[in-house]
Regions:
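Membrane-interface alpha helices of multi-pass inner-membrane proteins
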Residues: 41-47, 247-263, 267-274
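Perimembrane helix-loop-helix junctions
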Residues: 67-78, 268-303, 559
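Hydrophobic alpha-helical membrane-interfacial segments at the cytosolic entry of transmembrane helices
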Residues: 81-95, 253-255, 287-318, 407-408
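Active-site lumenal/periplasmic loops and adjacent helix-entry segments of GT-C-fold
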Residues: 93-194
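Membrane-lumen/periplasm interface segments of specific transmembrane helices
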Residues: 102-104, 278-282, 291-387
């Protein structure tokens, strides 16, 4: 993706965002967030209808039309607002660093699922769920960010993983812009100092909330946490009685975007709706009227929380893609595991609970503190900010501003229950007992909680400035941004110093593996729409090889299965059953070679040190023939 393609995509987001902020009565600093969420929702719906490229073209044309309707003197103040400058600062740093370093995928799910989603968008111009290449990637995940990638990939000449990582980092930059857009900065306040702090902190504000770095992974946990944080920032904004419908529509776009990132995003979206419901009810009680509106208004934000996931599930079912690892996540399986543990038939439920509880109490998550302690510290900070906000803003306004942070105290134990349910029903026994992805799942929740506390602190600082002497009134609003800059620098230092920001990690093993994959494609003579069966001498590497090489060889060929050659494999039956066109051997045992030597003219050979053994498969009337390549 050229710099020009990135600029076109960012401009499209901003122009749509400015138009939406005008219609929804939001500060201009929320334009990056509004534009991002609007495009994600539109492209998720367009991709679900197999019209992804049409949706991209309509968004680009619409952005040009919205720009043509606006005057120059209206756009410039919006571009110079602290929130927009913070977003542009973060995007600019990422563009420069990624162009220099060209980071790559490094971890399991980036190859097995998310990478295939983005490659399908680039090569097939459609979501993977519509793909005809029989990819084994799980189809249950919604694909809002792969859809957003289409907006940037349309003018791109080639597929690059750095471009994918850039797109997945945009929700974090948009959340930073929403956070710094919260204070209503006026000419009497230190606007320049505040804006400079925002631009310095935004590029790496969320460094603490990812196991490695939040900007160099295609996992969706950091983006879903960032959008959760941004939605909470929207709730923090003061809302006049005549603009509550518009605020509900803004939250509807945000909640809809949350549901398109990952399935857990629906849980976060419902959390946002719950807080919005309490705020609407509080406003109705304060105004002594409109109680019915206070009850009904939150449903404008709740509708996308149910409509978008339901439409996606119906599409998966219609395309026969609904059966995957998440099919057992109904309450029946959870109750079955609990019943078996209670009767002593199988202790699996209790074993997972014991490890879950131990990890919750003792595993260091952030700042060297356990997950439980971090939650307690956040709860204490929420109560303290309630007191400060009531003092600075008055009882009603202070309680309204502190409500999101207080509600997170209630959501904290509920979220623990949701994650325990996921470990029981949505993961393999090995993953559940190892507490896999613990940091990613909890950090996305704390990313939202930390951000709403930071937003409340910003509001408290600017509100308290009116109650303090002149010099103190100028200094207090700058305290929180300065603390954010310091915490950002501390997080970068904890992650490995400046090298972690400007010298992004690259997996050295990728160079050799990419060369092997390219050599395989060369030996396949440019095969298209083929399928491969991978066999490995090392049982622990069988599945890893399948996922990795399926990603590297996509879309020319796709993997249909992977097994260890040490298992009792019926090679002829499996090849015929799965319509395999290529057989790849990553080392085989002598017994395996002896059993199937008659399938190849010169017998089976093991993998060489530089490349696996590759055979073309020919099926003649049920008789399998292997030809070495």
């Amino acid at each position: 993706m050229s710099i020009l393609a990135q600029i076109i995509g960012l401009a499209c987001l901003l122009f749509w965002g400015f138009w939406l902020c005008c219609k929804l009565r939001l500060p201009a600093g929320f334009a990056p967030l509004c534009g991002l969420c609007f495009c994600m929702v539109v492209l998720q719906l367009a991709g679900s209808c197999n019209q992804l490229w049409l949706g991209v073209q309509l968004l680009l044309v619409g952005a040009v039309l919205t720009l043509a309707q606006r005057r120059r003197h209206e756009i410039l103040p919006q571009l110079l607002s602290p929130g927009v400058l913070a977003f542009c600062s973060a995007a600019g740093v990422l563009m420069a660093v990624f162009a220099i370093r060209q980071p790559e995928f490094q971890t399991w799910d980036e190859f097995s699922h998310w990478g295939i989603y983005f490659k399908s968008v680039f090569y097939q111009h459609r979501f993977a769920v519509w793909d005809t290449t029989r990819s084994l990637a799980h189809q249950a995940y919604p694909q809002g960010l792969p859809g957003l990638y289409a907006l940037f990939a349309l003018p791109a000449a080639q597929y690059r993983e750095a471009d994918v990582l850039f797109v997945t980092a945009l929700p974090l930059a948009a959340a930073a812009s929403a956070l710094f857009a919260l204070p209503q900065v006026t000419a009497r306040r230190p606007r320049i100092a505040y804006t400079v702090c925002a631009c310095l902190a935004a590029p790496a504000l969320f460094w603490l909330f990812a196991p490695d770095t939040p900007y160099t992974t295609a996992y969706m946990d950091a983006p879903v946490g960032a959008l959760f944080a941004a939605a909470l920032c929207v709730i923090l904004l003061p809302c006049a009685a005549n603009s509550r419908v518009q605020r509900g529509l803004a939250l509807a776009f945000l909640c809809g975007a949350l549901t398109t990132v990952k399935e857990i995003g629906t849980v976060f979206a419902l959390c946002v709706v719950g807080i919005w419901f309490l705020q609407c009810l509080q406003d109705a009680l304060r105004d002594k009227g409109g109680i019915l509106r206070g009850f009904l208004l939150p449903f404008t934000a709740a509708l996308p929380c149910f409509a978008i996931p339901l439409a996606w599930k119906l599409l998966l079912k219609a395309l026969h893609r609904a059966d995957d690892q998440f099919s057992s996540m109904g309450p029946g399986y959870f109750l079955q595991c609990w019943q078996e543990a209670r009767t002593g038939f199988d202790r699996y439920f209790y074993d997972v609970w014991d490890r879950y509880y131990a990890r919750l109490r003792s595993y260091p998550l952030l700042f060297g503190a356990s997950t439980f302690k971090v939650g307690c510290l956040c709860a204490a900070a929420a109560v303290l900010l309630l007191i400060v906000l009531i003092w600075a803003m008055g009882r009603w306004q202070g309680l309204r501003a502190a409500l999101p942070g207080l509600c997170m105290i209630l959501y904290w134990p509920l979220y623990q229950g949701v994650l325990f349910y996921v470990y029981i029903c949505g993961m393999s026994p090995y993953e559940a007992l190892e507490m896999a992805s613990w940091e990613r799942y909890f950090c996305c929740f704390f990313l939202g909680w930390f951000s709403v506390l930071e937003g409340e602190a910003l509001l408290a600082g600017f509100a308290a400035a009116h109650r303090l002497p002149r010099m103190a009134g100028h200094a207090v609003p700058a305290i929180v941004p300065c603390l954010l800059v310091c915490s950002t620098l501390w997080g970068i230092w904890q992650a490995g110093g400046a090298a972690s920001l400007f010298c992004l990690p690259k997996a050295d093993w990728r160079t050799e593996q990419q060369q092997i994959a390219a050599d395989m494609l060369t030996r396949m003579d440019g095969a298209q729409n083929g399928s491969i069966w991978l066999l490995s001498a090392d049982d622990s590497m069988a599945v890893q090889n399948m996922w990795y090489y399926q990603y590297e060889l996509y879309p020319a060929v796709t993997a249909v299965e992977a097994q260890s050659s040490e298992t009792d494999v019926d090679l002829g039956y499996n090849i015929g059953e799965h319509d395999v066109t290529w057989l790849v051997l990553f080392g085989v045992t002598d017994d395996f070679t002896a059993r199937y030597a008659d399938l190849a003219d010169d017998g089976l050979r093991s993998a060489q040190s530089t490349a696996p053994a590759l055979y073309a498969v020919t099926n003649v009337d049920g008789r399998i023939y292997l030809t070495a390549k």
